[in-house]
Amino acid sequence: MAGNDVIEIEGVIKETKPNANFIVELENGARIQAGVSGKIRKNYIRILVGDRVTVEMSPYDLTKGRITYRHK
């Protein structure tokens, strides 16, 4: 899969799960499970319930995603 075959969408963290996974409610109302990207993990960026985030999703599996940015 090429690196440009991703869907980027914003959402809000609704709950936390073990191992740095989160339930994110997207702008369209859907809820997905998302993990944190490597750069967020490497730089120790804290993500809490209620934070607004940008999520990358594969067009092949719309139930999982990767958190790539936490908005201020």
Swiss-Prot record:
NCBIfam families, A to Z: infA
- Entry keywords, A to Z: Cytoplasm, Initiation factor, Protein biosynthesis, RNA-binding, rRNA-binding
Location in the cell: Cytoplasm
* CDD domains (UniProt xref): S1_IF1
PROSITE patterns attached to this UniProt entry: S1_IF1_TYPE (PS50832)
User: Which InterPro entries has this protein been placed in?
Assistant: NA-bd_OB-fold, RNA-binding_domain_S1_IF1, S1_domain, TIF_IF1
Matches recorded under PANTHER family? TRANSLATION INITIATION FACTOR IF-1, CHLOROPLASTIC (PTHR33370:SF1)
Under what name is this protein listed? Answer: Translation initiation factor IF-1
Entry's Gene Ontology cellular component terms: cytosol
Question: Hey, which family's this protein in?
Answer: Belongs to the IF-1 family.
Biological source species: Oenococcus oeni (strain ATCC BAA-331 / PSU-1)
